[in-house]
Amino acid sequence: MTSARILATVLSAGSLILAAPAIAHADDWGSAQVVAGRERVKVTVTGTQYPVGHCRIDPSIGTPDTQSIAMHPSGTIVINNLKPGTHRVAVWCPQGGVISETDVQVQPGNLLLDLQDQAYAAAGSSDKVTDPALR
């Protein structure tokens, strides 16, 4: 393999990694996946192995906009009305479970694309939805 091919392979693999959602692991405690969208993030928690009643999500930890939002210990939640920019999203489950902090880039809102996404979702064409946090 030539140097140019090796470089092209490495660069293309890097671009795939950048396009992937952020996944935070806590070994056998479970995992949290955070996907940023337009003024929202989607958080999915899976694999919690201990009996926990709920998990907590903070989509803006370390800022004046910090919150603590409850969610089921295995499931998905979409948190709306976030300011565009970098957010550190914290996920933790009391009594054991996922503990993670993930940096994501929240995009600015776009009313026309949001309306289009709602129409696609209502028509059963969720594969055409443009906001990753709504897929």
Language model region names:
Residues D28-P64, I69-A70, V78-T86, W92-V98, ...:
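Composition-driven, intrinsically disordered low-complexity tracts enriched in small residues
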Residues M1-A26:
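Secretory targeting and sorting signals
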